[in-house]
A protein has these predicted regions:
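Conserved, structured C-terminal
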Residues: 1-183
């Protein structure tokens, strides 16, 4: 093909991947790629499920105005040793968040989706909410990431319940990521 492309070894799925940027009509490149053995087209739902399995936070879900990097367990990437940067003072005052990101794994086929409330078993007051959730094709179980109150003493193995369309569904807190491909 006589077409310029920008090929980036990037992605947001936890898998090896490439992003191809094309000026103009990408259809010939698309057809060439699909003709290769092992290449399958997929959509954004596939990308988002892989992101969730890899435990990667996404802005608008696990990151945003309501959640700091500390809430998303990303405090280690902030360099407070730098003299000054935009937001440094605000981040210094947010080192101890009220909510923190946890991984949840369930059983069966009922996945807790974004904004579903999370409860301690038998309790009526929500302790947080799901930020991302799906049925994991890789693990064959429902998984979710949730922002939960840090003052509840939750740890890996703790049991919680998700309100899935009016029914309490049991989940256990698990270590993130849910899945990491062997390299």
């Amino acid at each position: 093909l006589d077409q310029d492309v920008f090929l980036a070894r990037t992605g947001y799925t936890g898998e090896d991947g490439f992003e191809i940027f094309v000026a103009g009509d990408p259809s010939k490149i698309w057809q060439l790629l699909l003709a290769q053995d092992g290449v399958e087209p997929c959509g954004l739902a596939c990308r988002d499920t892989l992101r969730l399995e890899a435990g990667m936070p996404l802005y608008g879900h696990e990151l945003g105005i309501d959640y700091t990097p500390f809430s998303a367990n990303l405090g280690k990437v902030i360099r407070f040793d730098k003299d000054q940067f935009v937001g440094k003072q605000a981040l210094e005052s947010a080192k101890h968040p009220d909510y923190r990101l946890f991984g949840l794994a369930g059983q069966g086929r009922r996945a807790a989706r974004a904004d579903y409330e999370i409860f301690l078993p038998g309790e009526d007051v929500a302790i947080g909410k799901v930020t991302s959730g799906a049925l994991s094709p890789t693990l064959q179980e429902p998984i979710a990431m949730a922002m939960l109150q840090v003052d509840q003493g939750l740890e890996v193995g703790s049991e919680v319940e998700a309100d899935v369309r009016g029914t309490r569904v049991p989940y256990k807190i698990v270590q993130l990521p849910f899945y990491k491909r062997e390299r």
